[in-house]
Amino acid sequence: MTAATLAQLRVDNSFAALPAAFYTRLAPQPLTAPRLLHANEQAAALIGLSADALRSDEFLRVFSGQQPLPGGQTLAAVYSGHQFGVWAGQLGDGRAHLLGEVAGPDGNWELQLKGAGMTPYSRMGDGRAVLRSSVREYLASEAMHGLGIPTTRSLALVVSDDPVMRETVETAAIVTRMSPSFVRFGSFEHWSSRRQPDELRILADYVIDKFYPECREPRPGEAPGPDGALLRMLAEVTRRTAELMAGWQAVGFCHGVMNTDNMSILGLTLDYGPYGFMDAFRLDHICNHSDSEGRYAWNRQPSVALWNLYRLGGSLHALVPDVEALRAVLDSYEVIFTRAFHQRMAAKLGLREWRADDEPLLDDLLRLMHDNRADFTLTFRRLADAVRGRPQGLQDLFIDRDAALAWFERLAARHAQEGAGNDAQARAAGMDAVNPLYVLRNHLAEQAIRAAKAGDAGEIDTLLALLRDPCVEQPGRDAYAALPPDWAGGIEVSCSS
């Protein structure tokens, strides 16, 4: 099904059908003289929208906030949360407007404008997003999708000359995000903290019925009842979150702001702010300049996710009195994360299966990379060339070339232990298929931002083409797979957007 126009989309408003306390209905505040910088045909196909529709005047009007989505009900949602480990109280969509929910060929997608003006939840904010951060978010979601990591998606990027004050005066933009749902851990925390169990139950029922209907069915040996459905939902959220963290860690991705209000109830990567894909590897790499204590450093992300899950579990305690049952569900996190992470790392190292004694091999590689500031992405990518008998490129990434070669010889010996079918070329090809050559490095995003400021979306097009299939080498694109230039070291990203 491909709709010729926005008016032909099948629009639902399931979140708007919740009681009024869950949101505020309001219209966006349109940008002045908006211009469509980019529209994503792949994301549009998810809602059955044709390429021609993306070039229509109506498309620009809807996704610049000038008119509502046909059939939609625009609103901003309320939620609360912990920010940097501290209870922040009520938060909510301070600059995001949910336009509606569209039925696509393979499922429903909510469409949300980010940067579309103030809402009752803006607190001290101005409701706007700047071009810089909007380009970064637009690219990041598509990059993560290309890596096979669950994420929200990007549909459109609209820009304007409207001034926005941050550290300096910047210009405004609106990025349209797509997700099956924007419900967060903080959505549950909100009602729990306010001691409103009826609203908490309504939210839980909405999430279970719409996204986890299988949780209504007792598993073998379980007694039926509402507590069981909630526990099964929590178990599924725990599984998805653990597997998401394994995906982040395996590609060297740092989110930067893992507050509970930025954690998706569907296990998606949500809210791309001061994120980063690591260049020089540090176990304790901090991508967010605002994170002075390193709470959200790369090596802390899995434990922070569990901490956040405990906040979600604590919110559900108002509905599930059995604390031990909640704890038992959350205790499954570490096993799930470890298994998922090892599966990913086994594939990256060219191992057919992970063994318990492979842990020192991986730990020693990460420590060696840390000590030598070796590039994360290229280290894993060049392992395949070493398997092909060309270890020099791998060694070039390390100050201690001999140590790098010695470690690789340990990996080669481990490969040899796998016995029959130990074909080097086939193994190397398998490694190339999971170790990306292209990731959204900060300097590549910065180049796209600079071009976008001049009204040129060419770099966005180029990056999207590479990032959608990041493991496949493209001719003439060596610069996009190279080590970052010296000037990239001066790029700082923070919570200011």
From Swiss-Prot:
The Swiss-Prot or TrEMBL record lists the needed cofactor(s) as: Mg(2+); Mn(2+)
Query: Which amino acids does the record list as binding ATP?
Result: G92, G94, R95, K114, D126, G127, R177, R184, D271
Q: Which UniProt keywords apply?
A: ATP-binding, Magnesium, Manganese, Metal-binding, Nucleotide-binding, Nucleotidyltransferase, Transferase
Name the Pfam families on file.
Answer: SelO
GO molecular function: any one? magnesium ion binding
Q: Where is the active site?
A: D261
EC number, UniProt record: 2.7.7.-, 2.7.7.108
Broad EC category:
transferase
- Give the reactions, separated by semicolons, that this protein catalyses: L-seryl-[protein] + ATP = 3-O-(5'-adenylyl)-L-seryl-[protein] + diphosphate; L-threonyl-[protein] + ATP = 3-O-(5'-adenylyl)-L-threonyl-[protein] + diphosphate; L-tyrosyl-[protein] + ATP = O-(5'-adenylyl)-L-tyrosyl-[protein] + diphosphate; L-histidyl-[protein] + UTP = N(tele)-(5'-uridylyl)-L-histidyl-[protein] + diphosphate
Query: What is the annotated role of this protein in its UniProt record?
Result: Nucleotidyltransferase involved in the post-translational modification of proteins. It can catalyze the addition of adenosine monophosphate (AMP) or uridine monophosphate (UMP) to a protein, resulting in modifications known as AMPylation and UMPylation.
Protein name (record)? Protein nucleotidyltransferase YdiU
